[in-house]
Amino acid sequence: TWIMRSDIAPHEASKKGLDVSVCGSCPLRQAIGGACYVTLHQAPLAVYKAYKKGLYNKAVDVTRLKGRKLRMGSYGDPAAIPFEAWEAVAQYTNGNTGYTHQLNHKAFDKRLLDLVMVSADTPKQAAKYQASGIKTFRVKVESMPLLKGEVECLSDTQGISCIECKLCNGQNKSVAINVHGRGTKAHTLKYGKGL
């Protein structure tokens, strides 16, 4: 799923700092120099343009999702969408994955924790969340060890895609992945000391 504004292209929203409505307080937002991996001028922009041309139905028959796998927020934070909408969709799917940085937002709906992982930016933050029973997803520098109870992302270790793995659904184990892609340098500079 693509969570984006309908009034401005995603890459423009990011450049202007108007992506808060879809990304919340995520520290990985490109607008604030974060290491978000989403290439906004590619797939998200294509989806936005298709929407503006009227190629997306405004009403969706969620039963058509029966047996399909759901990525909650290929771009955008799932917390930007009411829990009831996700619940209505997820009941028909064959598994889901998703991540949120909004756990500490005053309006965060904790029911979402049954469907998504909480993104943790540091080992200390991950350990704090995990101690309260929350499943976390953490991007780490390769030299950093896994925390007790964490598993390494199967994409890293076995080349299994997220949608096939489905471990990141808020119900299984906490997961950590080695930083990769174009945000590696920025992430390593900000979080490389493992605080």
Spans of features found by a protein language model:
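Class I S-adenosyl-L-methionine
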Residues: T1-L195
